[in-house]
Amino acid sequence: MEIEIGRGKKGRRAYGFDDIAIVPSRRTRDPHDVDMSWTLGPHRIELPVLASAMDGVVDPAVAIALGKLGGIGVLNLEGIQTRYEDPGSHLERIASLPPAEATRGLQEIYRQDVIPELIAQRIREIKAQGVLTVASLTPQRVERYIDVALEAGLDVLVIQGTVVSAEHVSSVGEPLNLKRFIADLPVPVIVGGCASYSTALHLMRTGAVGVLVGVGPGAACTTRQVVGVGVPQATAIADAAGARMQHALETGEYVNVIADGGMSFGGDLAKAIACGADACMIGSPLAKASEAPGRGNHWGMATFHPELPRGTRVRTTTIGTLEEILVGPAHENDGSLNLMGGLRNAMALCGYDTIQAFQKVEVMVAPALKTEGKRLQQSQSVGMG
């Protein structure tokens, strides 16, 4: 329903994860009977989680570890891992930068060009461990580097930018034709981000197997303040899910909706899937792992843009191992550990046994969900406080 912004402008009301609640149904289910797997092209993935293609979150070791746990780690092929043979010292420098110098320091570190040989080396390193090898490139550089990535054994390509559309217009060069490019590739492609029904639908029509949904919700992203663009995630995901339904009616093909950003706790992942997501791409929750390359830091991949940075470096507390954060066991009670356990139990409490079934769960607008009755927790900064 549209509301009046002013006499000359109307708009829709949109909702984030904190604005909504999942409603339990008349049936409950044993958590052990819940199947959280999903399909990405020809690949069956055990857990509906992808680690964001961010340098403080994923390096080859983390991608391998996540793959063995049942998820996916997306390596950024334009990041620090492909600019330096030994990125360790540069990651240490990023971690040591004072807040006032962080953006300038990142701009300097990322001034080094991407080295194609390192793209091949990193992909082969992950591939050698027998896990699904997934990596990202921007639309601006994907044609330049895709061949070396494919030759090294890339399994799934992610074409990712702040906002990616199927109809980019440019007067200064020939824009990437996504539909033609994807059709010519021998591997499945995920593309995004987007945050609206129409953009998601047109991206699905390019032949992508998945669409990333999220513009600016991430913990280290400042896009929404710098350019004022974005849509709260619950609404953005639900709109993309509507586009998926329309696309399926048109073609008979199912395209995955992947919620990208804005999730910190197990309940957030559950809400994303309840709104229509098939899987969740997360960054800051995994940046808190002891194995994360950020050394207790997390930064957006537009932070080092030379002209208009749209991200920041944030400090994250190391709260556990990658395994503990993803699948437990948890030793905290706020939902930041055992994310998949939180999702599994949400599905069980509502009586659903698959991801696609759980997308049908009832959701209501409930802005008091996280505060109702929680004054003691808030006053003591424990639990949900």
Locate predicted features:
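Active-site entrance/lid segments in N-terminal catalytic domains of soluble metabolic enzymes
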Residues: M1-E250, L286
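Alpha/beta catalytic cores of nucleotide-metabolism and tRNA/nucleoside-modifying enzymes
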Residues: M1-R26, Y110-V114, L118-R124, I190, ...
